[in-house]
Each structure stands twice: as C-alpha cells, then as structure tokens.
C-alpha cells in the first residue's frame, strides 16, 4: 500500500486545476475562461494608463489578471497558463527574458522538488505509514477526530518550526498515508479535499498566532517598534493573536464539514481493530525506517533552529531550502538513501506552474503595479472620513484580502504596515493596535495555489481543485477578518491596547 501512496502524489492531475471538484459551475468556468481571460487582458492593456501607474505596471497587471482568470477557470492546463504568462511578460517587454526565466531557479522550486523526494522516501520506508497508523489508533477514532488531530499538530509545529513551507513538507506525507488508509481517492473524495485544505488553512492560521511563525510577523514587529515606538514581545503577540486564530480554525473546521460533506463516503468502516492489526503487522522499526527517522529528525532540528544557527555558529546557518535539499540528497544517496530519482516522481508540470505564477506576481511588484493597487485601496476609500471603528474593520478586511493582488507576505508587510501606522497617526488612532491587527491577517494566503508555497505543496497531491480552495479560502478569510475585528474591540481592550 505504500506504493499506492507514492502514486497518489505522482498521479496528481495538474492539467486544468478545476476538473477535480466537478460540478456545473466549474464546467461553465472552463467554457468561458479563455474568452474571459482575453477580454480581461485587452481591457486592462488598452485602457488609458491611470495616473500613478506606469505603462509597464499596466502591462503586468493585464497579464497577471488574465493568467489568474485562466488558473481559476481551468480552461487550459495550469502549467500552460504559466508558460503563456512568461511568454507574454517577455514579448510585451514587461520584464527582461532573463528575469522571467529565472523563476524556475527560485529557492521555492528547489524546496518543492525536495518535498517530493522527502515525501516519497517517508512513504516507501513505511515510516509515514507507521506514524499515521499510530496517530489514528491513538487519537483519531473517527475521521473528524483525525482531522482535529492534524490541526493540533499544525498548531504545535508553528511554535517549533519557523517556516510555513517546512511545516507543509512535514505534514503532507502524513496526510497522504492517512488518506490511503481511509481509501480516499484523489479528485473524488470530499474527505481528501477537506483534509488537504485544512492542512493549508491550519498552517496559515497557526502562523498568524505565533510571532516567530514567519519572517513577515517579525518584520511587522520591527515596523511597530521603529515607527510606533512600541516593542511587541513574543508573549504579547501570542496573547493578542492566538485566541482569534484558534476560534477561526474551529469555525473553519465546522464550515468545512458542511462544504465538503463526506458522510456518504465508504472506506470508514475499516474498524479500529483492523488498523491496530496493520500497525502490529509492521513489526519493529526496519532499517529503512530508521534511516528515514534519522533524516526526518535531522531535517526537523535544522528547520526548528534556523533562526538561531548564525548566533550559535558565528554567522553560519543553513536555510530552510538548503536543509530540504540536504535531506533530499541523503534520501537519494546510494547506500545511505531510501529511493531512486525515478521513484521520487517529481512533477515538473507543477514546477512550471509555480515558476510562471511567481514570474507574473514579481512582474506586478517590480513594475510598481501592486503598489499602485494597494495605494488606491488604502488612500482611495476615503478612510479619513470614516469613524475609527469603521477604519479598523476596513483595514483588517483590506489586509486580509490583499494577497489576492500580490502574494508575498514580506512585501505586503513592508508596504502596508508602515502605511497603516501613518494612517493611524494622521487620524489620531492607536497605531500599535491598527498595525498589530492588520499584521495578524497577512499570513492568510489561502485562496489560490499560487498564493503561497504551502498551497502549491498541498495542491500537488491532487486532492482538491483551484475552485475548491478558492471557495473555502474566501470563507475562511472572511471568518478570520470578522473575528480579528471583534477581537480588536474586546480582547485587545482587556490586554490594554487602546483604539
């Protein structure tokens, strides 16, 4: 059965992105996707260039929006859309050819390649299967409890592994094995859809609750200290952010049960006794499992200590990406490793898809198109005329959905947090409260596969479609924004943050 799990990853269908979910709405989207994308491209490209937006930014905006339309509609394979985006970026002179092509060499591409290798190694060695069976028999007596256990693990890892992508690389192999045990078929099982999408969302929501969960959080803290004069500590962030994060995740879980109802699925009748028999049948740890465990623990330690290595070793440190490459190399090394290159089943169509997505997004940023859009949103809504309570809500919702325009948490933090601090000072509001609340939303990059590295890693399993993620992600973002807004007016006040 471990071989089947590997195949479930390698056979993930990236041809269109929306055929996985099925349904009339997706069929209509596929039919109108190409003409709609052409219309969007032509409209944005040929309209008079707005004041403050360069023509290069206008071209980047047209290409990005047209590509986004095709990715969501799934009218053509998503990797083909990425290739068209790269072609359009270069032929229109929006970016230089070298810049468009170099995205295939980004560190995230290496991380994704390494994630495929690590996943295949954990599966083939049976270590992932052993852990999954142990987890189910110990804590996951029902499918719902299994999902809750996975959410808990994601939140726990956020404290120890300061990288969203690293945590996804750890969790995906476990999820694949669990779904194999439950006989969930990629593209057909609602349980599979929900498990993978909850993985995406738990990763992001947990990150918002821990200051060290991502670099963007720490950048926000730095801006608040430098521009608002307040030093936000680890526990300050945790106490302010974690309650809304936990409530958001719980509500999202129950919404997911409604959106992806799996009660009619078969495969859950396999009794706990049989699962315990399977676990017992694995016997003692085998040599491949011991090798996999050593590689896994080494990888986890390097990921968890990334932020401290330079201080410990006089400026020397190993990044999350290099750690993944080292681990993948060990898995492939003759005599030491666990799998061959062919067994890794690396999906290069996914790499092309990701490269094109980053090329389009980076072009929007480098041409100042993204900054122009954010500027219009921040200063074009007439916030200075609104009541302070309304400003908080608008800013929180704006921050939450800003990843729909461009995806980098770091870039959005760098652009938006100083702008919100300045806005608060102008309006006589508390800049710390406004900036902190906005910062909690910036990790919610959960609505489309290109919006984060985590999304692409989970999307590679083939269990959910672009449209599945879009509808669930939008609901989760709305819930998160509402709860953070309520937290500002209640919980923040108890913690001493004034409006």
Q: Where does each model-flagged region fall?
A:
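Helix-coil boundary and interhelical linker segments in multi-pass alpha-helical membrane proteins
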Residues: 228-233, 421-433, 498
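Transmembrane alpha-helix interface/packing and boundary motifs in multi-pass membrane proteins
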Residues: 68-77, 153-163, 200-211, 397-409, ...
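Hydrophobic transmembrane alpha-helices of multi-pass small-molecule transporters
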Residues: 1-111, 236-375, 475-481, 485-499
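C-terminal structured "cap/appendage" subdomains that terminate the fold
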Residues: 427, 435-468
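Alpha-helical transmembrane segments
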Residues: 107-117, 161-169, 237-253, 433-443
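Membrane-core helix-loop-helix motifs of multi-pass transport proteins
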Residues: 182-266, 454-488
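Transmembrane helix-bundle signature of multi-pass membrane transporters/permeases
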Residues: 117, 155, 173-177, 196-207, ...
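Membrane-embedded alpha-helical segments and adjacent helix-loop junctions characteristic
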Residues: 49, 66, 79-80, 84-186, ...
């Amino acid at each position: 059965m471990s071989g089947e799990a590997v195949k479930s990853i390698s056979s993930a269908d990236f041809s269109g992105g929306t055929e996985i979910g099925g349904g009339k709405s997706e069929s209509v989207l596929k039919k109108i996707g190409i003409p709609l994308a052409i219309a969007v491209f032509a409209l944005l490209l040929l309209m008079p260039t707005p004041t403050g937006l360069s023509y290069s930014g206008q071209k980047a905006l047209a290409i990005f929006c047209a590509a986004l339309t095709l990715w969501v509609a799934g009218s053509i394979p998503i990797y083909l859309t990425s290739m068209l985006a790269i072609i359009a970026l270069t032929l229109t002179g929006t970016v230089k050819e070298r810049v468009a092509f170099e995205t295939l060499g980004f560190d995230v591409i290496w991380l994704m390649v390494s994630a495929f290798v690590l996943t295949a190694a954990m599966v083939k060695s049976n270590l992932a299967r052993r852990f999954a069976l142990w987890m189910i028999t110990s804590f996951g007596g029902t499918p719902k409890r299994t999902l809750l256990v996975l959410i808990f693990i994601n939140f726990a890892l956020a404290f120890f592994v300061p990288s969203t992508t690293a945590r996804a690389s750890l969790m995906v192999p476990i999820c694949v094995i669990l779904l194999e045990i439950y006989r969930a078929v990629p593209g057909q099982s609602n349980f599979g859809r929900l498990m993978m999408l909850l993985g995406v969302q738990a990763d992001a929501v947990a990150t918002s609750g821990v200051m060290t969960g991502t670099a963007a959080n720490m950048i926000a803290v730095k801006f608040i200290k430098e521009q608002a004069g307040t030093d936000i500590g680890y526990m300050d962030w945790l106490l302010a952010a974690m309650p809304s994060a936990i409530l958001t995740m719980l509500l999202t879980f129950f919404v997911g049960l409604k959106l992806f109802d799996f009660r009619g699925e078969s495969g859950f009748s396999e009794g706990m006794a049989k699962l315990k028999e399977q676990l017992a049948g694995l016997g003692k740890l085998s040599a491949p499992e011991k090798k996999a465990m050593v590689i896994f623990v080494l990888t986890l330690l390097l990921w968890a200590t990334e932020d401290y290595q330079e201080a410990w070793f006089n400026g020397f440190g190993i990044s999350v990406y290099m750690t993944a490459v080292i681990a993948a190399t060990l898995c492939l090394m003759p005599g030491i490793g666990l799998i061959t290159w062919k067994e890794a089943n690396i999906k290069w169509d996914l790499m092309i898809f990701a490269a094109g997505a980053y090329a389009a997004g980076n072009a929007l940023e480098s041409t100042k198109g993204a900054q122009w859009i954010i500027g219009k949103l921040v200063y074009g809504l007439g916030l200075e005329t609104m009541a302070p309570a309304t400003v908080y809500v608008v800013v929180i919702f704006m921050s939450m959905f800003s990843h729909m325009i461009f995806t980098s948490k770091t870039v959005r933090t760098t652009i938006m947090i100083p702008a919100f601090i300045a806005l608060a000072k102008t309006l006589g509001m508390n800049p710390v409260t406004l900036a902190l609340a906005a910062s909690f939303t910036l990790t919610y990059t959960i609505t489309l596969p290109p919006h984060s590295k985590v999304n692409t890693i989970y999307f590679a399993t083939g269990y959910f479609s672009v449209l599945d993620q879009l509808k669930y992600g939008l609901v989760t973002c709305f819930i998160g924004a509402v709860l953070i807004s309520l937290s500002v007016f209640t919980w923040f006040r108890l913690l001493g943050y004034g409006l």
